[in-house]
């Protein structure tokens, strides 16, 4: 038996297998003709992420990962970047537009991180941002106000590409807690040092 949890159709109960699907991550971008959106699909088996796929239809880039088998971009193995810290790092993020109560905390994080890095990008698809971390395009990523379908596939991609993933306090509640930090091991730890005290 398979269950489906999808942004567009809600939750369907089932047994051991649970598909987590976002058929269009970056809906606002798509509606405005901004070319940054993706399809995100993850499969959990008995509560554990086993497979993830993020597809960028405009660039024909398919990021895939299976637990224990690494991460790939169009069948080519990918790894997180080797950057040793925030100096010169390129970060990805997203703004908490759904819940303005988080805005002050987020702006504090942004202010702390922007001065130490080469730049911060906000493209608008959390799934693609996480895929970019896995491929070494972003050195780290952080965002709040997210849903499980925004991050499930991307989180597995990052882990299988040698990166680390957590919630803002360093815990494991990143799938359902609404917040995520991801990156190569060094940049992940540096971003986490900023997010922890500002919560």
Model region roles, listed by residue range:
Residues 3, 9, 162-179, 184:
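Acidic, metal-binding active-site segment of PIN/NYN-like and related structure-specific nucleases
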Residues 13-17, 86, 134-137, 175-177:
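A short, glycine/Asx- and small/polar-enriched loop/turn
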Residues 27, 56, 158:
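Conserved G/P- and acidic residue-centered "switch" motifs that form tight phosphate/ATP-binding loops
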Residues 42-130, 177-199:
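Acidic beta-strand-loop-alpha-helix segment within the catalytic core
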Residues 132-135, 155-160:
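Hydrophobic residues within well-ordered alpha-helices
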Residues 135-140, 163-164:
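Alpha-to-beta junction loops
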Residues 139-148:
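Active-site neighborhoods of divalent-metal-dependent phosphate/nucleic-acid chemistry enzymes
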């Amino acid at each position: 038996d398979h269950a489906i949890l999808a942004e567009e159709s809600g939750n369907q109960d089932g047994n051991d297998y649970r598909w987590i699907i976002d058929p269009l991550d970056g809906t606002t971008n798509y509606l405005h003709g901004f070319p940054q959106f993706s399809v995100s699909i993850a499969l959990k088996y008995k509560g554990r992420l086993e497979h993830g796929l993020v597809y960028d239809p405009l660039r024909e880039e398919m990021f895939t990962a299976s637990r224990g088998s690494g991460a790939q971009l169009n069948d080519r193995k990918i790894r997180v970047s080797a950057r040793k810290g925030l100096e010169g790092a390129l970060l990805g993020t997203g703004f908490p537009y759904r819940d303005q109560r988080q805005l002050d905390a987020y702006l504090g994080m942004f202010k702390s991180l922007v001065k130490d890095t080469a730049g911060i990008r906000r493209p608008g698809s959390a799934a693609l941002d996480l895929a970019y971390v896995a491929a070494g395009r972003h050195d780290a990523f952080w965002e709040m106000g997210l849903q499980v379908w925004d991050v499930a596939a991307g989180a597995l991609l990052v882990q299988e590409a040698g990166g680390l993933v957590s919630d803002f306090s360093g815990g494991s509640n990143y799938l359902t807690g609404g917040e995520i930090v991801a990156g190569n091991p060094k940049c992940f730890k540096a971003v986490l040092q900023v997010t922890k005290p500002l919560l």
